[in-house]
């Protein structure tokens, strides 16, 4: 599916916008602070229920307004789907799909698989493990129908178990939680391991094209010792967990490590190389989804020109075109994206929250 129309109301510095979009490349050009990133963020929020630059809802809603409203029209090969999201200052959300209320944000995420490439996205490579878990979980969510429910239940059980650790004195008192937690943890870890194995070749091939000077390796770490039953780990770690008042081992501690020539990429690669690697990983993940399910991602790319020279921008542009996906690109100057444009592209000018084509 592609987003054929986007309506934005009271989001960031955008009062009202109604955009007719290209199913191919859409360029957002404007000075820093003009609102071009806000358009990308509106699309991302419509598909995720939250913004990517701030978790504080008050910063996302336009000044002195009570709520933002986002509406989109998704065009598929056989049908059109209408989607909407409203969120107020209290954080209450309303999701509407095809004119009916009561839907979940996860349904929007399923309808709009998207890949985000921003200057802040370096956290995938040099941030904590939670960012790389999120990378794997995106793939599991779109590959495994039961993943989201299992993941939600895991979060709930871990929260309850951690609260119980403050009150219990013997491991036997935790067994009711662990009886539910253990099979969930093992299932989620299995899904993550299978996904990381399945996508490994795609990542290796794409990374080789973007960074041929490095030998890159990927390894999934499930969050507890290899060849050890999670039940044994939980029981053996009880006293330490009780002192810490949290569960120290499990899928919530998993990681997906990436090395270049045997060393952590964050210690080896320059910022430009890290951006190329981030782009390669996002592309590989999107292309894997298309091959496995026939569904195409939306790609959101903020500040396209930063950190990349002309040759590398050209490589990224050609790979994005090859996906035949819908792509949204922000840039300070139209010169940075003109070589990516064709007769099906749309160029939007953004100035002080006003968007024109």
UniProtKB/Swiss-Prot annotation:
Main location: cytoplasm
InterPro entries: DNA-binding_RecF, DNA-binding_RecF_CS, P-loop_NTPase, RecF/RecN/SMC_N, RecF_2
Coiled-coil segments on the chain, per record: none
GO cellular component: cytoplasm
Binding residue positions for ATP: 30-37
Annotated keywords: ATP-binding, Cytoplasm, DNA damage, DNA repair, DNA replication, DNA-binding, Nucleotide-binding, SOS response
GO biological process: DNA replication; DNA synthesis involved in DNA repair; double-strand break repair; SOS response
The UniProt record lists the keyword DNA repair: yes
GO terms for MF: ATP binding; single-stranded DNA binding
Record's keyword annotation contains DNA repair: yes
Any one Pfam family match given in the protein's UniProt record, by short name: SMC_N
Entries under SUPFAM superfamilies matching the protein: P-loop containing nucleoside triphosphate hydrolases (SSF52540)
Location(s) in or outside the cell: Cytoplasm
UniProt function note: The RecF protein is involved in DNA metabolism; it is required for DNA replication and normal SOS inducibility. RecF binds preferentially to single-stranded, linear DNA. It also seems to bind ATP.
Family stated for the protein in its record: Belongs to the RecF family.
Protein name: DNA replication and repair protein RecF
Lineage summary: Bacteria, Pseudomonadati, Pseudomonadota, Gammaproteobacteria, Enterobacterales
